[in-house]
């Protein structure tokens, strides 16, 4: 079994759980985006002594975003620190382009492409420095529901020393917002897949109005 936790794990108890999962044949990856996060993981793992280093993915982010490294230089500093850790194994890179928006609520491709290029550049630089852990394959992952076709196209052309596995993380927990994705998705009103593959609204939610405190507000 393989699971990607698309977040940093910095709570000691949760890090201990991850360490124990390694001894049970369970392959789990989490993100790393700071020296502070590395220090927390090192401190906990030094006490737990996992059977092998915990695999982590270096996370890139965008200005104003929730997480992730903002620049190539910052990313390489963190990658070098992971490579020095006896308890962590740098096994790939990651990012999330889904929150990149322009022209109101409708995402556009250009800033997404620039962000993907940044992930590619960081991956190449880490690979050139030999900081990726020798493993059966290198994982590069991004995810969003509007431009996953761009993600696959750009990341799958990466050339690395290790075999490459591209993972897309598109899809919400239960359902999507049909309104915005009907316009933006490569399987929306204007398909970009080369086929007439269109997403169809499959869930309708009913609710009860509890209050109308003022005109036009419910």
Give the residues covered by each predicted segment.
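Short glycine-enriched loops at secondary-structure junctions
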Residues: 8-11, 36, 96
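N-terminal active-site wall of soluble small-molecule enzyme domains
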Residues: 1-22
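Acidic (Asp/Glu)-rich catalytic clusters
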Residues: 18-25, 42-54, 79-89
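Internal, well-ordered alpha/beta segment that forms a basic, Gly-enriched binding/recognition surface
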Residues: 26, 30-52, 60-64
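Flexible, acidic glycine-rich loops studded with aromatic residues
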Residues: 196-218
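Active-site loop/helix belt of alpha/beta enzymes
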Residues: 55, 61-193
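Short, charged, surface-exposed secondary-structure boundary motifs
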Residues: 13-18, 40, 177-181
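Glycine-enriched alpha-helix->loop->beta-strand junction motifs that scaffold or abut catalytic
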Residues: 1-3, 22-27, 46-53, 108, ...
């Amino acid at each position: 079994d393989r699971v990607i936790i698309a977040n940093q794990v910095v709570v000691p108890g949760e890090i201990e759980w991850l360490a124990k999962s390694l001894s049970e044949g369970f392959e789990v990856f989490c993100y790393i985006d700071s020296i502070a996060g590395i220090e927390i993981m090192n401190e906990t793992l030094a006490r737990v002594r996992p059977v092998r280093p915990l695999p982590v993915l270096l996370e890139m982010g965008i200005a104003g975003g929730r997480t992730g490294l903002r620049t190539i230089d910052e990313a390489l500093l963190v990658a070098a620190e992971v490579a020095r850790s006896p308890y962590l194994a740098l096994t790939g890179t990651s990012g999330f382009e889904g929150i990149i928006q322009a022209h109101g609520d409708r995402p556009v491709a250009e800033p997404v492409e620039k962000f993907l290029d940044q992930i590619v550049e960081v991956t190449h630089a880490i690979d050139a420095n030999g900081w990726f852990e020798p493993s059966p394959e290198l994982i590069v992952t991004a995810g969003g529901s509007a431009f996953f076709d761009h993600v696959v196209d750009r990341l799958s052309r990466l050339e690395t020393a290790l075999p490459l596995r591209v993972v897309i993380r598109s899809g919400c927990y239960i359902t999507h917002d049909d309104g915005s994705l009907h316009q933006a998705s490569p399987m929306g009103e204007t398909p970009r897949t080369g086929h007439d593959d269109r997403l169809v609204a499959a869930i309708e939610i009913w609710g009860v109005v509890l209050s109308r405190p003022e005109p036009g507000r419910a």
